[in-house]
């Protein structure tokens, strides 16, 4: 079985972070291993506390996984502190498999999840190693200063991200007005990934799910455009199956094929041939 190493924070509510990553990886048919970088106290109403895991513990987890189990791809999420970012850079430098970086720079309420030093190191040392980086609009602004306010700004925002060194950018435009559209580019080719907008507030874990599905397909041998298309379809169906949990925004549902529900209205324009509904 193919392996994906996730380096990210824990979500006590189970909707995002490594919890969402592991559900996604299982649904996509790969084995997920984890390095916990931070523990968060969060639920459907928001993030109520963040505690960084000591960097020695982060390094020990990285060594334990990589020295014995190995990995076919790495996906990073919330890294929090500069020492943790450096530990990840040290561990992934020279690894042969793809690296997916989800910058996870801001909470849903807009609170920063990286220290200023960590953010600088992310720009300077981790992003140049990335096969694909998957920022949302707020993270593009945080990392580059470029504001993406409409679909016409997507190329400019993605171009600014490419200047930081990743090979590909998958810029998530779900918060733009109109039809949700993401832009995948390596600076030479540009592909728009579209899906119908789903009228729901139950979207917790969307970014983690997309990035982990992308990493899973890369680990299974897909090229970046194929993996991005498959990940887009997977997350679109997970959003359509999102469910209420708690008093706020509920999570997306990565394993909805086990729990039938009304189909997604319309069809995602990046269908993966031969895959049944709600599969990865």
Residue positions per predicted region:
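Short, small-residue alpha-helix embedded
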Residues: 19, 24, 141-142, 201-224
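Glycine- and other small-residue-rich loops at beta-strand/loop junctions that grip anionic moieties
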Residues: 10, 76-77, 111, 203
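Conserved phosphate/ATP/ADP-binding segment of small-molecule kinases
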Residues: 113-190
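Conserved N-terminal subdomain of the carbohydrate kinase-like
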Residues: 1-6, 18, 22-108
């Amino acid at each position: 079985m193919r392996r994906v190493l996730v380096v990210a924070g824990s979500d006590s509510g189970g909707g995002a972070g490594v919890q969402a990553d592991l559900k996604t990886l299982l649904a996509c048919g790969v084995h997920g291993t984890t390095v916990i970088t931070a523990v968060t106290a969060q639920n459907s109403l928001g993030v109520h506390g963040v505690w960084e895991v000591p960097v020695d513990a982060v390094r020990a987890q990285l060594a334990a996984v990589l020295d014995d189990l190995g990995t076919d791809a790495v996906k990073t999420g919330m890294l929090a502190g500069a020492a943790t970012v450096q530990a990840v850079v040290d561990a992934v430098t020279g690894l042969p498999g793809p690296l997916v970086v989800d910058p996870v720079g801001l909470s849903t309420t807009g609170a920063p999840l990286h220290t200023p030093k960590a953010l600088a190191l992310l720009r300077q040392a981790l992003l140049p190693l990335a096969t694909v980086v998957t920022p949302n609009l707020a993270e593009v602004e945080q990392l580059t200063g470029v504001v993406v306010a409409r679909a016409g700004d997507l190329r400019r925002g993605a171009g600014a991200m490419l200047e930081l060194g990743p090979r590909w950018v998958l810029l998530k435009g779900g918060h733009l007005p109109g039809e949700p559209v993401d832009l995948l580019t390596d600076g030479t080719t540009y592909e728009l990934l579209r899906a119908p907008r789903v009228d729901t507030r139950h979207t917790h874990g969307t970014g983690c799910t997309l990035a982990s599905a992308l990493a899973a397909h890369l680990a299974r041998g897909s090229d970046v455009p194929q993996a991005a298309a498959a990940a887009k379809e997977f997350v679109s169906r997970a959003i359509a199956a999102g469910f209420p949990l708690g008093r706020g925004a509920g999570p997306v549902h990565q394993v909805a094929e086990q729990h039938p529900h009304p189909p997604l209205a319309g069809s995602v324009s990046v269908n993966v041939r031969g895959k049944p509904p709600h599969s990865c």
